[in-house]
A protein has these predicted regions:
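Structural motif
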Residues: 3-11, 225-226, 565-573
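A general boundary/transition motif marking the beginning of the first structured unit of a protein
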Residues: 3-7, 36, 579, 609
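Extended hydrophobic/Leu-rich segments
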Residues: 3-4, 26, 707, 727
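SAM-dependent methyltransferase catalytic region
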Residues: 7-288
């Protein structure tokens, strides 16, 4: 009673953000962050609810919005009931003497549904909704009357299968009621904040069958993003609203969906069939992109305490005939210079008060095969006929490299990747000398992984190797073609770097940033997260039966053979030309929108002089990035104290203390200078190169060679910037 007399929202936040975490820890269940479950701020909830109320009136002729008879609502991921509470409050705010009306009583207790999997928020939701009604003078009800069911939304089986602990005796009754909602009730509105979890454990046959429409026709190497829980929840809602219980093939069901979710589906290349399905199912779609990813602008705050970007999406089906393709309306906070959480909440509050027209929506023009739900302007159509670095599964167009793959994937980077060779040897010695229990406790690895790695080590079927871990950051791993603590060794591609002289190119499939700097040369095996997300590697040569052959597709070899310039060029010269293009600022800017959609493409239809100039500059860049060029520059170590103490430790500093007055501060005794802001901020992929190198070595005692590598890295970056300026003149 004491709790219920306190402010409703603060109680709910406390229970959901603190008690629920402790409860889950106690039960040893999956952590909230892994499951993607977070309390939804009220500004978000109220904006979605008010927008749906508006659309009910303007699009579905429900003049009273949620108050209208026959408007049945489901929150498919109820949590502590914030969305349903907002619906309750919306209904109450529009009714005088609300509880004297039996129809309104039925609205609360018969037309509003919720599904929740976790016990604690399920209880909190009932308490919250009960308190709202009691505060408004209605007491003739029980919390048990609410249609909120302890249930997994994605479990669509018609026969119960209870394989989890539940502190309720009437779980069977709960399940039957939820099943009735899923399979029998017609809903008009589905809303909520579904969990985001890329490693989804929801693998029921029914939901996977429904999900096939989002995967149909895809031949991408990795469609794992489509298995995220939030994607499954969206597919469930689409099916429930528009497809389930159709009387006949020609019936067009109507309704609304309103969610806040991970925003990966609006511009993910793998999500193109999902977007196509939504586009062809609804009449109108509204996408409010709130951004907030740690890969977005540095000052772009998330509306949640998470690192993935989010968006609000509203889906509307109101016409009597099948959709001919939705009108898609888009608004981006980033494009409108709205970056702080406070500003984003203010925008949402404005929409809540003034309606959807408070936003200046931009109608998108969607094209096959991608159906982007974001603003994209493709002006330079000639790019589409260039040669892709690798095979583009979406468009199946001409490509250069035959053998390529994403880089190595470890089971745990902090174990499988070490800063120096000795540290890697120490890990392997532990695997050999410690007991099973000691190893599992120290390294938190499954014992089978430890045994596999140890077997490879003792049988000499693996070896300690350098690895291109991050840009200009070569570290160490234990490599074997079989799985150990390298979960995916990518041997088919990586074998061509093992004890063999080779060059390779690291690149990405599409940029997730508003810039492109995602390519670098390599000469060793590479990490799969090289640029901060999925990264690919293509060797220049393949070693087949002791023969060294160029790693080019048959189509590109035929093109090369008949090309007036390429026919006389070596694979190295072609790589140099490619590399110069990828580092050309003008190329990066001109084709940025295309570089966000697929593997980078290269134009070989150039004049002889242009090719030769680019190949010359590209060769310099390749040698530079492999640290094979001698650089004479004023950048050097400087001592910060008169005693000139030789201190090789990288002290842990905040960025404001790390880079001061054109100096990189390594510790209280040593710095590198002069370093311009341009050098310090130089970025490859998702990493600020120098900053990231230092971050991996906080509180680490460097060798002299490691510090010399850092010094040379600064010089390499400076010269790279100079060469890029030369390229920009073309």
């Amino acid at each position: 009673c004491k709790i219920l007399n306190q402010d409703l929202e603060s109680v709910s936040i406390y229970l959901y953000e603190d008690f629920l975490k402790a409860y889950d820890d106690l039960r040893a269940t999956q952590k909230r962050k892994e499951g993607g479950v977070f309390y939804t701020p009220k500004s978000i909830v109220d904006m979605i609810v008010s927008s749906l109320d508006e659309l009910l009136k303007t699009k579905l002729n429900k003049n009273k919005g949620f108050n209208d008879q026959g408007v049945k609502v489901l929150d498919f991921a109820t949590g502590t009931g914030s969305f349903l509470a907002s619906v309750f409050e919306k209904i109450i705010s529009k009714e005088s003497e609300v509880f004297e009306n039996e129809a309104i009583k039925n609205k609360f207790l018969k037309d509003i549904y919720g599904f929740e999997l976790s016990f604690v928020p399920y209880i909190v939701a009932r308490l919250k909704l009960g308190q709202i009604l009691r505060k408004n003078g209605f007491v003739n009800f029980s919390d048990a009357d609410f249609q909120i069911f302890l249930n997994n939304t994605l479990d669509l089986e018609k026969i119960a299968n209870f394989d989890m602990f539940m502190p309720l005796e009437n779980l069977d009754t709960e399940w039957k009621k939820a099943r009735d909602v899923k399979h029998s009730q017609d809903l008009l509105v589905i809303l909520g904040n579904p969990p985001y979890n890329a490693k989804s454990k929801n693998k029921g046959e029914d939901i996977l069958e429904l999900l096939k429409i989002y995967k149909q026709g895809l031949n991408d190497k990795n469609i794992q993003p489509l298995n995220d829980d939030y994607i499954k929840f969206m597919r469930f809602a689409q099916w429930k609203l528009l497809e389930q219980n159709k009387k006949d093939l020609f019936e067009e069901k109507k309704g609304l969906l309103g969610f806040i979710t991970n925003n990966s589906f609006i511009n993910g290349k793998t999500h193109r069939k999902m977007r196509e399905s939504l586009y062809k199912s609804f009449d109108e779609i509204y996408i409010l992109n709130l951004h907030g990813s740690d890969k977005d602008a540095k000052n772009d705050e998330n509306v949640f305490d998470i690192k993935v970007g989010v968006c609000i999406s509203l889906f509307v089906k109101y016409k009597d005939e099948p959709s001919n393709g939705a009108k898609v309306f888009y608004y981006s906070t980033g494009d409108n210079n709205i970056f702080s959480r406070k500003e984003k909440f203010a925008l949402l509050d404005d929409v809540r008060q003034k309606g959807l027209n408070a936003i200046k929506w931009e109608e998108l023009s969607l094209d096959e095969p991608y159906f982007w739900f974001i603003k994209r302007e493709f002006k330079n159509k000639e790019y589409e006929n260039f040669w892709a670095l690798a095979s583009d599964k979406a468009e199946d167009k001409k490509s250069i490299f035959l053998n390529y793959s994403s880089g190595i994937q470890t089971e745990k980077d902090n174990i499988a990747i070490q800063l120096n060779k000795q540290s890697m040897e120490n890990v392997l010695k532990d695997f050999k000398n410690l007991t099973k229990e000691e190893n599992v406790k120290k390294y938190n690895l499954d014992n089978s992984i430890i045994l596999n790695t140890l077997t490879q080590y003792e049988n000499n079927t693996g070896f300690i190797s350098k690895i291109h871990y991050r840009p200009f950051d070569i570290q160490w791993t234990f490599y074997s073609e079989k799985q150990g603590f390298l979960g995916r060794p990518r041997y088919k591609t990586m074998q061509h770097f093992l004890d063999k002289e080779n060059l390779g190119l690291c690149f990405i499939e599409s940029s997730i940033h508003d810039y492109f700097s995602h390519s670098i040369v390599c000469s060793n095996i590479t990490d799969g997260n090289f640029f901060g997300f999925r990264s690919f590697t293509a060797p220049l040569y393949l070693y087949v039966n002791n023969e060294k052959i160029p790693n080019f597709t048959s189509e590109f070899l035929a093109y090369k053979e008949n090309h007036k310039i390429l026919k006389d060029k070596s694979p190295e010269e072609i790589l140099y030309f490619i590399y110069a293009n990828l580092y050309n600022p003008r190329y990066r800017e001109k084709y940025l929108e295309y570089l966000k959609t697929g593997f980078a493409r290269i134009n070989f239809e150039v004049e002889q002089k242009t090719f030769d100039d680019f190949a010359t500059l590209g060769k310099k860049l390749v040698e530079l990035h492999l640290f094979k060029r001698d650089l004479k520059d004023e950048i050097d170590f400087i001592f910060l104290k008169e005693d000139k103490k030789a201190n090789f430790k990288i002290e842990k500093y905040q960025e404001k203390d790390r880079f001061i007055d054109n100096k990189i501060i390594l510790n209280e005794d040593l710095a590198i200078s002069p370093i311009s802001a341009e050098i310090w901020q130089f970025t490859i992929g998702g990493y600020q190169v120098i900053k990231q190198w230092l971050k991996y070595r906080n509180d680490y005692e460097c060798s002299k060679e490691e510090l010399e590598h850092l010094l040379k890295m600064c010089k390499v970056i400076k010269e790279t910037i100079n060469l890029q300026k030369e390229l920009n003149d073309y």
